[in-house]
UniProtKB/Swiss-Prot annotation:
Position of the signal peptide: none
Mop domain segment(s): 280-345
Family listed: Belongs to the ABC transporter superfamily. Sulfate/tungstate importer (TC 3.A.1.6) family.
Keyword Membrane listed: yes
Binding-site list for ATP: 33-40
Name listed for the protein in its UniProt record: Molybdate/tungstate import ATP-binding protein WtpC
Species annotation: Pyrococcus horikoshii (strain ATCC 700860 / DSM 12428 / JCM 9974 / NBRC 100139 / OT-3)
Keywords for this protein: ATP-binding, Cell membrane, Membrane, Molybdenum, Nucleotide-binding, Translocase, Transport
Name of encoding gene: wtpC
Any one cellular-component term (Gene Ontology): plasma membrane
Listed PROSITE patterns: ABC_TRANSPORTER_1, ABC_TRANSPORTER_2, MOP
Length: 345
């Protein structure tokens, strides 16, 4: 449906370099990256707000690179929602329909239908300043969907919401997608949004799209250490592999497949299980470790573990920390399955 070809742009402090990807009909495509990686600039280039220095954008095979935003039939939801403060919710939602010269009765019908679907039909007489963040977001989404856009562009759509409102809107976004059948490009730094909503994801780091693929594949099989570290592989270790065994100092770690020679592997902290004593487990990799650090992260606690000179980090729940009675300096057992190990190419 949409094809982005070799887009480059120097814009203020941002530099985009040779960005290429495609978006399929009916897909929810996530652009995932940290703040400052150029995600919003890329989205605004696709929207037609900013012109690229090089490259082109094709919609159904037609070059739309020079087409103004109003001719693209895309709906763009910026991070601040950009609702008109002097207009009611009804008039905000109706704005795009009125620009298209839709008859008044048809405008009223379409606005009420989309407002009912998004659960805001009781707010149509209100002004944006009287709404909560979640309600404002629903209004912005309703305004975007009511015109039946070719493509929905969303810039950090849930960034300004509290955790509960965000979780609710993510669940409802799945329902709205089924109901309205839209195609979306969704910019975010949130792993939760990517995993919950995305079909495919493009990882954007320092102005480059460094990996594109199915969301689950990218998260489980990052193609570089840079991508892996961004996606939460805090434990990256180097050793010498002899078939299914990786030798790291005095440790012998079972690998998910045969590998030979010097390699580097990654293990997520959440894939390491902690026991206070040796137990029978399906995990082949079980090692005695000393707890060298305990970091409180809220619901989770990060443990820094020393396995014979090899430092690993593991996540456990706060309740598990209390139940197990883990303290700094104590010995524990750390286990992880061979299948949890990612071998870097």
């Amino acid at each position: 449906m949409l094809k982005v070809e070799s887009i480059s742009k120097d814009y203020r402090e941002f530099k985009l370099r040779e960005i290429s990807f495609d978006v399929r009909e009916g897909e929810h495509f996530i652009i995932l990256g940290p703040s400052g990686s150029g995600k919003t600039v890329l989205l605004e280039i696709i929207a037609g707000i900013i012109s690229p220095d090089r490259g082109r954008i094709l919609l159904r095979g037609e070059d739309i690179t020079g087409l103004p935003p109003e001719k693209r039939n895309f709906s763009y939801i910026p991070q601040n929602y950009a609702l008109f403060p002097h207009m009611t919710v009804f008039d905000n939602i109706a704005f795009g329909l009125k620009l298209r010269k839709i008859p008044r009765k048809e405008v009223a019908r379409k606005v009420r239908e989309v407002a009912e679907s998004l659960g805001i039909d009781h707010l149509l007489h209100r002004k944006p300043r009287t709404l909560s963040g979640g309600e404002q977001q629903r209004v912005a989404i309703a305004r975007a969907l009511v015109v039946k856009p070719e493509l929905l562009l969303m810039d950090e759509p849930f960034a300004n919401l509290d955790v509960q409102t965000k979780s609710k809107l993510i669940r409802e976004m799945k329902r709205w997608r089924k109901e309205f059948g839209f195609t979306a490009i969704h910019v975010t730094h949130s792993f939760e949004e990517a995993l919950s909503l995305g079909d495919r994801v493009g990882i954007m780091l320092r102005g480059r799209l460094v990996q594109v693929g199915d969301v689950r594949d990218v998260f489980s099989k990052p193609k570089s250490e840079e991508v892996a570290r961004f996606l939460g592989f805090e434990n990256i270790i180097e050793g010498v592999a002899n078939g299914r065994i990786l030798k790291v100092g005095d440790l012998r770690i079972e690998l998910p497949r045969e590998v030979w020679g010097k390699v580097r592997v990654g293990i997520r902290p959440e894939d390491i299980t902690i026991f206070m004593e040796g137990v029978k487990t399906s995990a082949r990799n079980v090692f005695k470790a000393r707890v060298e650090g305990i970091e409180d992260l809220g619901a989770l606690v990060k443990l820094t573990l020393n396995l014979g000179g090899i430092i690993l980090r593991a996540f456990i729940t706060r309740s598990s920390l209390i139940e197990l009675g883990i303290r700094e300096g104590e010995e524990v057992y750390a286990s992880f399955k061979a299948s949890a190990i990612h071998v870097f190419p």
